[in-house]
């Protein structure tokens, strides 16, 4: 894939083509980019169920045609029963099971908050039932099982088989579904119908919330009805980076948006435009190590921050980090944060309203726990907490966990506006940097910037080692050079899903919309 799709009225990019089409249908009916994104978010929760769902969290970056962007933090806090005492005797929080399902799922609150913003911006609204219609239909009538879903189910089967509700929900006759088969989710269809009829807020304050809380109590999850009722999506100020090419935005803590902006801020002080592949990878990897150090030292629940994250993006903060990079040698490297099953999606409508959105349940199938009679698999984002009371990420009721999720946007000096992002744990900020560097600084066409071979320092979806992973399509000379520089290189497949599913939309000054999707996904850039 080398050519982008270009349209005149609207564009939607998602890692599953059915979600792209759901968004496009809303745009064709006159809906806003925000409404289209809610439709896509609901659809992809059904058609890519191993990656995301109603039981996860979400983050939004909404860029109006003029003025400042609006961020939404729709992540949930630890439940009121999630105390250190509740995990006494354990070294770390389990990654699977009811004790891993310890944070409120916030993504539906983000849909609701985003629709309020849409009404404020446009003065009109499509019914929620219309926005959820495709998702309900796919859950009820069945989805085509992707190779990604089939592989995730089979590879994690022994780990997840005995988690409450998992086998009944995700297996067919006791086995992982086959790629290309039809897979139905009737309980989830019923839940979506309740949201369509009772409103999205019913997930937290209504009959659905009561059903969720009853299931949580029965399974021994540390979340209560009171925790659901107390949850609200928030609108934090986004982080900003003043780059030579324009203004870049990302999400504030508890996300690692700081990392994504710091990498680009550091490399903005290096010569990236003329760098060859080995130099590009080396410099971004070295910037990544320094940005990860900032992350690990500072990022936590925003109420517990010891610094102003925005101050870490000033020229005075970034220049010393850039100066410390040695073009002839790789610096030492510790370890990453681990995997993240996530979907990034983008939508831009005819008015120029642009949305960068990300939704996740953390690991594949999250905690593995499916709440009774709902079809909702609950996230395990709380596994990011520490059981060390002195740790920056120490578990406490009501505390937000660290998030790898971070949707990005940029308003460039030449008039272009870009929304972009990726799934993939530690890989998200690195993929953002690769895409931005190739497209904006090196003049590589948008689709080719995503399709070209990528790299990953650390761990991500399906990976456990902390090496520098390169796709096999990198030239042998590039791989050899990176090893000479001291990088511990591991070569993966030519197109590896470990590199995440990236996407981007660019609105050009003439109003044309250019969309690009990832050949590593099942996605599409759908426009009209």
Per-region residue spans from a language model:
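Short, small/polar residue-rich loop motifs at catalytic or cofactor-binding pockets
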Residues: 235, 339-342, 403-405
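A short acidic/small-residue loop/turn micro-motif
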Residues: 77, 362-364, 425
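Internal maturation/activation junctions in enzymes
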Residues: 271-361, 373-374, 381
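Extended C-terminal subregions enriched in glycine
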Residues: 281, 304, 351, 399, ...
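Extended C-terminal regions of large enzymes
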Residues: 250-255, 410-427, 439
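Short beta-strand scaffold segments in enzyme catalytic cores
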Residues: 52-64, 343-348, 407-409, 499-507, ...
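Noncatalytic scaffold domains of N-terminal-nucleophile
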Residues: 1-28, 33-198, 203-205, 210-248, ...
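Active-site rim segments in enzyme catalytic domains, especially the processed small/beta chain
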Residues: 46-70, 222-225, 353-418, 442, ...
């Amino acid at each position: 894939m080398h050519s982008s799709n270009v349209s005149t009225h609207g564009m939607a990019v998602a890692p599953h083509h059915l979600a792209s089409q759901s968004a496009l249908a809303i745009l064709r009916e006159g809906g806003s980019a925000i409404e289209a994104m809610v439709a896509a978010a609901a659809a992809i929760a059904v058609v890519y169920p191993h990656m995301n769902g109603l039981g996860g969290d979400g983050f939004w970056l909404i860029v109006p045609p003029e003025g400042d962007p609006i961020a939404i933090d729709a992540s949930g806090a630890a439940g009121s029963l999630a105390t250190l005492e509740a995990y006494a005797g354990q070294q770390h929080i389990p990654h699977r099971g009811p004790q891993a399902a310890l944070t409120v799922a916030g993504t539906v609150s983000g849909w609701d908050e985003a629709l309020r913003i849409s009404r404020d911006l446009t003065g009109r609204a499509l019914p929620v039932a219309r926005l959820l219609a495709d998702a309900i239909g796919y859950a009820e009538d069945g989805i085509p099982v992707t190779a990604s879903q089939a592989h995730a189910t089979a590879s994690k089967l022994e780990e997840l088989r005995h988690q409450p509700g998992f086998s009944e929900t995700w297996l067919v006759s006791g086995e992982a579904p086959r790629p290309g088969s039809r897979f139905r989710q009737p309980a989830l269809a019923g839940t979506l119908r309740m949201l369509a009829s009772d409103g999205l807020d019913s997930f937290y304050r209504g009959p659905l919330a009561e059903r969720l809380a009853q299931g949580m109590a029965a399974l021994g999850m540390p979340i209560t009805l009171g925790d659901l009722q107390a949850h609200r999506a928030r609108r934090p100020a986004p982080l900003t980076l003043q780059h030579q090419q324009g203004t870049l935005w990302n999400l504030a803590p508890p996300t690692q948006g700081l990392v994504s902006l710091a990498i680009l801020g550091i490399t903005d002080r290096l010569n990236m435009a003329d760098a060859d592949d080995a130099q590009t990878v080396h410099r971004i990897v070295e910037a990544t190590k320094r940005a990860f150090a900032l992350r690990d030292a500072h990022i936590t629940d925003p109420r517990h921050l010891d610094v102003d994250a925005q101050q870490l993006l000033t020229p005075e903060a970034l220049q010393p980090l850039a100066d410390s990079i040695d073009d002839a040698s790789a610096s030492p490297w510790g370890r990453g944060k681990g995997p993240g099953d996530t979907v990034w999606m983008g939508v831009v409508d005819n008015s120029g309203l642009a949305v960068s959105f990300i939704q996740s349940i953390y690991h594949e199938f999250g905690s593995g726990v499916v709440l009774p009679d709902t079809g909702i698999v609950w996230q395990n984002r709380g596994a990011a907490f520490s059981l060390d009371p002195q740790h920056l990420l120490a578990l406490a009721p009501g505390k937000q966990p660290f998030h790898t999720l971070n949707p990005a946007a940029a308003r460039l000096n030449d008039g272009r506006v870009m929304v972009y992002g990726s799934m993939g744990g530690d890989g998200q900020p690195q993929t953002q940097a690769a895409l931005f560097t190739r497209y904006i600084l090196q003049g590589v066409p948008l689709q080719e910037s995503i399709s070209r071979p990528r790299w990953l320092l650390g761990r991500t979806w399906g990976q456990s080692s902390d090496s520098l992973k390169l796709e096999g399509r990198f030239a042998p000379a590039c791989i050899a050079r990176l090893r000479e520089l001291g990088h511990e290189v591991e070569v993966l497949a030519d197109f590896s899903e470990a590199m995440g599913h990236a996407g981007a939309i660019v609105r050009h000054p003439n109003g044309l919309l250019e969309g690009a999707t990832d050949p590593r996904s099942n996605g599409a850039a759908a426009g009209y």
